Amino acid sequence: RQMCIRDRPDTNGEDWLFMDLETLKRDPDALCGKSTADFCALFAPVEAADSTDSSVQAETLRKGWAARGVTFSDGGCSMISVVFHDRFSETENTLFIGHVGVLLPAGDDGLYFVEKVAFQEPYRLTKFESRAALKSYLMAKYDTGWGQDTTPPFLMENDVLMDGEAAQ
């Protein structure tokens, strides 16, 4: 699926994404001709629902992206996002993407996942036999919460909650 960001009102997010935006200022070609407003529309936090249910939060994130003009269409690859829920205070309750990668078909025998795990590291290509295997890999790395009153990390495939083999 391909991502499209339509014209939209102010998307903000600069205060959350300042390190990314500084990097993009130094290397504007990394946006492939897109604007930092498009980057912020996708990666700026979205106001979270008052819930710890990942399906409720996934729908909240989808609606937040839609309000910013972020949509996905069918194509050969998918964006996989690890989404975190933070409740900093009574007035700060947000969802944000903590990690992202691209999922590609590997013919009849699995899936390729491309990710950048750290600025100083090269991109990594890993082959998985299934979405369930990819989910296990990502959750082992990022599901590190201990009894918080927030939603545990969850995965989105484009704008759909990824539940093992369910998202496609």
List where the protein language model places each region.
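Long, positively charged binding patches that form subdomain-scale interaction surfaces
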Residues: R8-L95
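Short, flexible loop/turn elements at secondary-structure junctions
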Residues: F84-R87, L104, V117
